[in-house]
Amino acid sequence: MKNRKKLLFILFPLLILLILLGRILCHPSFSTYTSRLFRQELAQDTITLHYTLSDPEAYGFKNMSASLGDFTYASFQKRIQDLKDQQVSLQNFLDQDLSEQDAMTAELLDWWLTGQIEMEDFYYFQEPLGPTLGVQAQLPVLLAEFAFQKEADVDLYLDLLKQLPDYFAQIIDFEREKASHGMFLNGESLDQILAQCNAMLTVDEHHFLITS
């Protein structure tokens, strides 16, 4: 299960580590930039934030509303524009005489931002569902292992549960749109996902969501 959580954040580990380093690097304005980008990325959804930081308030996350994320085209477009804005800001630092460590961080961020922005024309190539790493497989595990360190975490968890119907409704709408473009899941993957969902619905006293 620990490996599953690592796979969920496959795009973020190295990026986040380097951004964290940016908070103590010698160029103060670049440190401010990386800290802002760090917060922007973690603010995408509450579960990512909760699993990454044990004390979010120490990084400027205060009074945030619980969110599983937004799986709509409007949200996708906004994120692409935000990333473009971040890359424009980053160009100012790439042209400066940064320290070796700052320069390496800036180059990595530029590479990552470019890759994310290039997805702009490939919205329907996204696939939130999958037999192993799909949302329907990952989310129950993440919720089962959600850490409760303080009372506020309980409220946060309950707020996340309330959002599940709307979140999955967005994913269903997205899959319908993909199907209309002839890009729906292949039959084998679909059968595995449906079998997995049906198994989740077979609840007894040994179900991992209960025993955990």
Feature roles, as predicted:
Residues 7-212:
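N-terminal maturation segment of proteins
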